[in-house]
Each structure stands twice: as structure tokens, then as C-alpha cells.
Amino acid sequence: MAATLVAARGTRPAPAWGPEAIAPDWENREVSTGTTIMAVQFDGGVVLGADSRTTTGSYIANRVTDKLTPIHDRIFCCRSGSAADTQAVADAVTYQLGFHSIELNEPPLVHTAASLFKEMCYRYREDLMAGIIIAGWDPQEGGQVYSVPMGGMMVRQPFAIGGSGSSYIYGYVDATYREGMTKEECLQFTANALALAMERDGSSGGVIRLAAIAEPGVERQVLLGDQIPKFTIATLPPL
């Protein structure tokens, strides 16, 4: 029995026969940030990190995508899922949060930003493919990390990971994370976790983008290919 290929949500099914059946899958797939994203809270701020690969099916559409999206001066989000969906949600939240800040005449809270993401992702949960991590700093609570996975749930965590590559590093982050880590330790922790995920996950790759957010502001850096941590694979000696 001939198998019927079903394309991603929002696109037409791929034909089972004819000239179009042999067309590359990226012609029928939506752009996805397949991805590995991460955020860690430290005393005085947060660190965010993400890979930079965007895929359309098996085709790498962009090698240097910026998945760390600014929502306000000291609030960022990490995006995973459909690139179109996550960009649209991030733009809408940025717009709403900007007006909220103007009305209050003060910087918005990180919790407020996360709640806006949660509300939108839950309301349109049947239509969106978006997993988002919100992290930032505000004067009331300091550094905070919130996770809004697909479906619209919101939970605050000391650290959060997401995306297709996250399944490869749950053991590493659980074993390595500890309370009281410094900013530098969190940056190294995030870089190591992302590098491990990028080695195993075909939808994660490119460069590593990092951001440290604290009261003074945002510090961003990019780890290029020769700067990404390398992990050797043990091999048995020849017999």
C-alpha cells in the first residue's frame, strides 16, 4: 500500500505519485527553528543561549538565525517551533508590552511578558507551533526564567531548555546545574549544553548566540565554529 506523506501543519499534503512526488521536501515544508534553546538564572540576572540553524524540511534555510529576540530593554525570549508563528507571537507581545510600559511609565515585569506569551499561546494553541522561553531582569524580582511550551502552560524555573535538541541534554543539565552559579559559570554551562545538543541533533547547528541580562543591561556574544566547545567521543583501542 502506497504511503501518503503528510507535510507540516499549514501546508498541502505532499503527493504520493507524479512529478511533484520527487520534489525536495523543503518545497512543501514551512520554515522551522528546529533548534535548541536555553536560559539559566543566576544571582543578579539571567543567561540565554540558542543555536542558529533554521530548517525547511531537510534543507538548512539559514545557518546564522538569531533566535534570541528582544521583547523589552531587559527582557528577551528564545524561540523554537515554526519560525513564522514564533516571530508573529513575539512581535505581538513586544507591541503590547511597549504600550503597557508607557501606561505605567516604568519598565515592565518579566512575569508580565511571560503572561502575555502564555495568554496568546494558550488562546491559539490549536493553530500555533511555538515553544518559547522568556527570561530577563526587573527591579522587583531580579533575574527570572519562564517556560511556555506548546499548549500555553507557563512555569517559572531556575533554568529551562527547549527545542528538538533539548531531549539530548536533559541528563547533562540536571547533573551539572547547581544553585548559586555565577554569570561566567552560567555562560559556560549554557555553551556546553548547546554544543552537546548541536552534535547530536540534526535540526540544531550553526553558531551559538549568548546573552547575559542584568541591571546594567544586556551583554551579547557569538561563539563561531572554532570557538564552540568540543567533546571527544571515547573509542576503544584497536585489538
Curated annotation (Swiss-Prot):
Component of the 20S core proteasome complex involved in the proteolytic degradation of most intracellular proteins. This complex plays numerous essential roles within the cell by associating with different regulatory particles. Associated with two 19S regulatory particles, forms the 26S proteasome and thus participates in the ATP-dependent degradation of ubiquitinated proteins. Its EC number is 3.4.25.1. PROSITE patterns: PROTEASOME_BETA_1, PROTEASOME_BETA_2. This is Proteasome subunit beta type-6. The gene is PSMB6. It catalyses: Cleavage of peptide bonds with very broad specificity. The active site is at residue 35. GO terms for biological process: proteasome-mediated ubiquitin-dependent protein catabolic process. Pfam families: Proteasome. Belongs to the peptidase T1B family. GO terms for molecular function: endopeptidase activity; threonine-type endopeptidase activity. Keywords: Acetylation, Cytoplasm, Hydrolase, Nucleus, Phosphoprotein, Protease, Proteasome, Threonine protease, Zymogen. Transmembrane segments: none annotated. The 26S proteasome consists of a 20S proteasome core and two 19S regulatory subunits. The 20S proteasome core is a barrel-shaped complex made of 28 subunits that are arranged in four stacked rings. The two outer rings are each formed by seven alpha subunits, and the two inner rings are formed by seven beta subunits. The proteolytic activity is exerted by three beta-subunits PSMB5, PSMB6 and PSMB7. It is found in: Cytoplasm; Nucleus. The modification N-acetylalanine is found at residue 2. Residues 2-34 form a propeptide. Gene3D superfamilies: Glutamine Phosphoribosylpyrophosphate, subunit 1, domain 1. InterPro entries: Ntn_hydrolases_N (IPR029055), Pept_T1A_subB (IPR000243), Proteasome_bsu_CS (IPR016050), Proteasome_sua/b (IPR001353), Proteasome_suB-type (IPR023333). One of its GO terms (cellular component) is proteasome core complex. The modification Phosphothreonine is found at residue 69.
